[in-house]
Amino acid sequence: MQSHNSFSINLNQQKSLAKKRLKAIRQNDERALQQVKQFHTQPEKLTTESIQLADVQHALARELGLPSWSKLKAHVEELEFHKLAIHNREQPLDAELKTLHVRCGHDIQQQLKTCGFEGEFLPMIDPLCIGPIPNDETAFVAIRAQYVVDMLLPVMGREGSVQDIALSEQNKINTLLDEQFERIVFWVEHDTYDQFMLLRGLTLLEDTEGKVIEIIEFNQFPGTERFIGFGQLPAEAVRSCWQHRKAVTSKLRSQAKRCWQALISPTPQSLIELLTQHELDCLPNIKAAMKRHLQELPHSESGLSFTQQLALEALAEHSTPITVKDWFQEYQEKEPLPTLGDVMFYALLLPLTCSDKPLFSIDSLQKNWWEQQVCITEHAQACLEGSQPITQNYWVGGMQVRESNLWVWDHNQLSSLSHKEW
């Protein structure tokens, strides 16, 4: 029977699958052999005659995201241990200190309760991966609240005041800084949403002393589908992550501060310097996140951000309209570092419909946003080809993209990044 979760691995299933693949290979199934070779560390040595069960098991473990079959077995046993601990309602893992669990969303809030954690949960949901990141702390919350009201709430068909959004965010900051908590644990993945929330959180905690501050950080997890975030994981897997937390050291704080200062800079030079000249070993996923962040600057030929480019390329594959829901899913498959939720995605794309020559059409704004049908335009095709580039006005962190102050590049080589003045 198939596992209910792509990250709950059934060892007996994998043993059976390995035997079936070996049998198929022995019967000259070239496709099965190539599948094993794709993940084996020594594919050149594998032939129909020489391959052994251990080879198939080794490749299968690597396909699931583990280095060896023995590591796979250990991983499965570990998750079984945590599943039993949850079933037996063992003492909470965070019981020894009054703990605040910080996350950039609500996805694991219930899971933490299921796992038996007793600490409080703080969702810091302001998506710093999109919109302006102000360098003025006194105006930071208000500016971000204005962006949420202007760009995100309309997509959802919701109304809200800047004051209410700002108050909610300030209350979250107050909770983060609350002296009652003896330990703060950040749960983060490798994308820009999580990484920038972490930088923001550590910046806010810069003067905090006498607390344990820790990070649980993952960029992959063994399973049969692509790992995007903790929300995909079963409860026992979430519980197992606890043992991998790391302490926030003075060195990590220093690196985080440097990254934050680069992020709020009005030009990209500081980010480029960080990426090319500095070791950021305490923040293993920040460089990839920073580069992906820079890819939101316009492409030198099309004028599109990388998100817009990928989205329009996905839409260009369809000759008939598709729903926004399907469009987002297809974009996600192309995205090398999935970050955006569906609302954020659509908010970044909608401005492309507001010019004299829209890049995609919408059948009806009266529908729920995820049911709206979208279709690419001829102008978008020309834009993607570079023959009709567009100019836009938007924010990428501390950088304002506008025609009079334009940073563009090929979204590949940082050395191609250049400044255009009109």
Model-derived regions: residue spans:
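A structured, charge-rich N-terminal accessory region that forms the first stable segment of a protein
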Residues: 87-159
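A conserved mid-domain beta-alpha-beta active-site/ligand-binding segment of alpha/beta enzyme cores
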Residues: 235-316
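C-terminal engagement modules used by replication, chromatin/transcription, nuclear envelope/ESCRT
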Residues: 355-422
